[in-house]
Amino acid sequence: MTFQDSSHDKPPKDDMPPSPDRPIDSSGPYCISAIYREDVATFDFPIGANLTIMQITHDGDDRDRTVSVRTAGEIRLRRIPKDSSRGTKAFLTVDVHVSDPSLHVAKTWDHERKVLQVSTPQYARLASSGPHCVSLEVTAWFPEDAEFSNLLIESFDLTLRVIEDIKINVSGESKFATVLGRVAFPSASLLGSSTELPTTTSSTALDGSGSSSAGKASSGVPFSSRRILVETVSGSISGCYPLMDYLGMTAQSGSIKVDAFPQPVLPDAPKPAELEVQTASGSIEVNLPVRDALSSKYIPPPRNYITSIHSSAGSIKGSYYLGSTSNFRSMSGSIHIVTMPVLQAGSSDQSGLPQNTFATHTVSGSIKAEVLDPVFITMVPYVEERPERPPHPTPYLPIGDDDPYIIIPPSTNKALFKVDDPESFKSKTLRNLKSSHGSQSASISISYPAVWEGSFHAKSMSGSIKWAGDGLQIIRDKNGFASHEVLLRKGVDSEKEGCFVEMSDIAGSLRFAVGTTI
């Protein structure tokens, strides 16, 4: 092992974690004290299988006689340069700078399992004074349109970064997990025109047989994976992510601020598009593209969307889709969101349609939710292909028209959808959404589009209840001892028809609007 003095490489000014503004091709270390550079280690790997990259730590020598050592840096996913001497063969590079030549960084490459493990010391017996640091940059270089089965990137100290020039597809699961570092995907501004929103349904619509011409991501997000898991303890999560079958994000004290671009369903194995985001104390902001004044013709891929957003103490903001299940919960943080229903038209009491649910709940944080005009879709039942079986005699009589039996409606978990004609949206009403909005001490303000039809029930112990909207009929407006109860209807004769909105509070005010603001 040889070392070079890299103090002339213009390292950062201090030993802070790497800045988001750090040049992508900077050759300097991530900490100023790491002035000795090891020879760059290189490992070739084949595409098409699994790939695992891990950064772990080891204790080093006896802690009683050693000094602590910090690790800083990144694990990066990048596209191979066009002028690369390796052509289009994928490879890994490990670039190490250390503050003392005695520091040992272990690198292990298991070619059979496709696993790279890099271990950095937490402590070391060193003669020189500190602070001591290991600067580590691991880069996975991929050819364009590389494909993998599964991808696992894990680290204790490092930031995990996907560079905007990458273009790979993972058919299975991709997991990015770090304890102290951030997780950063490219931002929508860096991706540029590749994330322009579609304004027609041609790329996502299904014909009567349930086939689809959308084999790839319609929005051109460069990193594609059916399932993506992103986890960090103290770092933040940022960037632009595809929403295919599952997008899960978890942070303890770090914040989450991302854009999510929905992608078409996989016709051969249709699943819901599930978005799950959780934090303990960090804030959450996820933005999915919705139909608004700037993109009034946008049509998302017709799918069943499932959303679960939860924070113990952080606020929740952003724009989301309302599908079969949508839950937003925070203990002490506020919930301020814009939502767009992507649902089947009609009521749950008609044609056996399942009831869709939308819930927002806090303990002390305020709630403000706006429901936009819906995008209506129609289910195309998915028929799983099974090998034909030869007919065989049966001692049982076939079921006749007069025999009792149950018709089970198709499940949205295994179904294809097509977008209804956008011109027909104006003649349809939103009648298939059951909502609940509750808080203990904070105010709640909910607005629904003019096409909403159903019942509204609200109850508050000491707070006021106000409403606005054409066509709302007062069924009950009752003021009792330490309580106020209201029941309204629009376009229905009973609570069993159309949508149903339940609002409850102990001390906060309640505001409900249909087709207007209040």
What are these regions (language model features)?
Residues 1-518:
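Intrinsically disordered, low-complexity terminal regions
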